[in-house]
Amino acid sequence: VSITYTEGNLLLKSNAEFLSGYIRQATGYTPPVKGLKDGETAKHAINLGLDADIANKEGYVLTTTSEGIQINGQTENGVFYGCQTLRKSIPAEAQGADILLLAGSIKDEPRFTYRGMHLDVCRHFFPLEFIKEYIDLLALHNMNTFHWHLTDDQGWRIEIKKYPKLTEVGSKRNCTVVGKARSGKYDNIPYGGFYTQEQAKEIVKYAQERYITVIPEVDLPGHMLAALAAYPDMGCTGGPYKVSPDWGIFEDVLCIRNEQSMQFLEDVMAEITEIFPSKFVHIGGDEAPRTRWAKCPKCQARIKAEGLKTRSEERRVGKECR
C-alpha cells in the first residue's frame, strides 16, 4: 500500500508523509509516498486529493473500497482531518497485524470555525517535548487553535530580548503553594523555566505543520507580578514585588500612568508579534483590581486627564499601549 498526493502540492505531500509516519509507528510498515498527476489515482493505495465541490473549507470525504482509500478535501486542511480519521481507524499497536477496514464513506465537516485548547505554562511549566505532544493531541482531535498562556503572576515564560530580566528574574519563584490557594503551606522548592524565542518559533512551525494556529497570551494589566518583580518601576508602589508562589488575584498591577509601563507593553507586543504570526494576541484583561490605581496619584491624574468616570473605562486605559 502506498500513499499518493497531487504532484507539486507540498502541503498534500506533507499530509501524506505525516500519515505514512503514523502508519509506520502503529504497524511497523512504512507506506511509500508518491506524487501523481492532477486527477490521477492509484489502485490499492491511499489517495489524497482536493475537491472543490466539498462545501466546507475544513470538510473532507473519506471513501474506502476494495480498490483503495480516497481522502478528498476542499483544502489541504480538510485532507489532513481526513487523515486523522483514518489514523483513528488503525489500532494504536498493530505491529505485524493485518488491518481490515470496512467499505464505506465518511463525510465530515466542523461545526465550529474555532476549535481550540488552552494551556497554562505559568503556574506549571511544561518542557518543549510536552508542548509538541499536546499539539499532537490537538491534531488528533481536529483542533485548529492552541492558546498558549505564557505570562502570569506565577511566572513569565517567554523570552523578551529587550527586557532580559523578565526571564532572568520573572521566570523563577522561590516555592509553590501546596493544596488550595493561599493554604499557607509551601513546598520550599525553587521553580522556574521559560522558552527562548527560537523554541517558541519551533512550536509555531510544529503547530503550523498540523494546521494549528498558536495564539499567545500575555496577561495584562493584572496578573503581572512576575513582570513587576523584574521591573518594579512599572508598578504603582515601586515594590518590592516577588513572583507569586500562590494562586489567586493580587492587587499589584501595571501603573497606567507610568510611561515606562506603556512603553513596556509596546515593546513586548512588538516582539511577540514577530514570534507568533497569529491574527490574534490574547491580552487577558481579567481580574485586574483597581485598588492600587485608586491610591496612586499618577493613575488618578491620568484618569482625570482622560475624563474617565467608570471603572470599566479605567480598565480600558490600563490595557491600551500609548
Task: Place the predicted regions along the sequence by residue.
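An active-site-proximal structural segment forming one wall of the substrate-binding cleft
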Residues: H141-F146, A200-P221, D252-G284
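Conserved small/polar residues in nucleotide/adenosyl-binding loops
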Residues: R315-C321
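Active-site mouth loops of central-metabolism enzymes
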Residues: G116-F130, V253-Q260
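Conserved, mostly hydrophobic/aromatic
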Residues: I23, T75, M117, L138, ...
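Contiguous, structured surface segment used for ligand recognition
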Residues: V1-Y114
